[in-house]
């Protein structure tokens, strides 16, 4: 079975096309056939003006048309498309969603932050982890950060905070926003031992690649602090030149590190696992679960 997931984020949109094969015991394996990322950067419009501009509307439409062609070319049987923080906040989101549906047949669901947090966990990372530990999923995006806390393999807490990389770049995160996150972490992680962070999102994936760590090995908080100092001390142009970062990654990587570091500090966590999965992976698994229910 071929499935596809479209994630229209605040910084970029992604199309993930996966092949699902099932073994004799009925256990599915998900193989990535293609992942296409387009830096739409919707948040720069929405967080300033409250709506998606004419230029960005054109960009999204062209991107969705390309995605529709690719899904046809790959013979995708079922697909799902969601939009997150920037689209949630856009006054003209219904108009944009309707136009895309009429011209491409892609039906975009604008999902809540809490549902976004649950979908990250659908990637089933925790199934392969030590049940004696507690895990805090930290998904940092352009418009929001989703926190999902598991203890003894059970969901204890999940919440979406309006703290994201583009909001930080635009100075749109208040002290009250940070305080809300700090108190949530203190309240829910108080007295919990052996809590390990699991980081998802394009920025932490990039840091993991730069670190040259082997898959499955954690990033220590001190290493993240070093990267934060290093990137903060140079210009966006230097980050592009010295670290081979894309322009749409080079400006958001510092605020992303700031968010991860604050969360690790407030949650008393020293290590972060980076499974290199994201919302699109969770969406594909969610779609498969629905298709086979």
Feature names for model-found ranges:
Residues 27-44, 72:
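Conserved ATP-binding subdomain of kinase catalytic cores across diverse folds
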Residues 1-30, 124-161, 202:
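Gly/Thr-rich phosphate-binding beta-strand-loop-beta motif of the actin/hexokinase/Hsp70
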Residues 45-74, 78-134, 149-293:
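Helical "lid/coupling" subdomains associated with nucleotide-phosphate turnover
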């Amino acid at each position: 079975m071929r499935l596809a997931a479209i994630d229209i984020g605040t910084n970029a949109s992604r199309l993930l096309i996966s092949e699902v094969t099932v073994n004799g015991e009925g256990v599915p394996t998900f193989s990535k056939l293609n992942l296409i990322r387009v830096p739409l950067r919707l948040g720069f419009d929405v967080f300033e003006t409250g709506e998606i501009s004419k230029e960005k509307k054109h960009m999204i439409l062209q991107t969705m048309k390309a995605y529709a062609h690719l899904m046809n070319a790959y013979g995708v049987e079922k697909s799902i498309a969601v939009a997150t923080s920037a689209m949630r906040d856009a006054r003209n989101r219904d108009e944009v969603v309707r136009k895309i549906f009429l011209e491409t047949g892609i039906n975009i669901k604008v999902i809540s932050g809490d549902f976004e947090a649950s979908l990250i966990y659908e990637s089933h990372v925790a199934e392969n982890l030590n049940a004696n530990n507690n895990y805090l999923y930290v998904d940092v995006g352009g418009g929001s950060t989703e926190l999902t806390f598991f203890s003894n393999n059970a969901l204890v807490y999940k919440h979406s905070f309006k703290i994201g990389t583009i909001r930080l770049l635009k100075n749109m995160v208040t002290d009250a926003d940070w305080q809300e996150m700090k108190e949530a972490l203190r309240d829910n992680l108080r007295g919990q031992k052996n809590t390990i962070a699991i980081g998802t999102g394009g920025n932490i994936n990039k840091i993991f690649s730069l670190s040259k760590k082997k898959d499955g090995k954690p990033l220590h908080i001190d290493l993240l602090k070093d990267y934060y100092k290093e990137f903060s001390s140079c210009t966006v142009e230097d980050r592009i030149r010295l670290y081979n970062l894309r322009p749409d990654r080079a400006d958001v990587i510092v605020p992303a590190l700031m968010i991860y570091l604050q969360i690790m500090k407030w949650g008393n966590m020293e290590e972060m696992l980076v499974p290199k999965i994201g919302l699109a992976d969770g969406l594909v698994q969610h779609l498969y679960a629905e298709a086979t229910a």
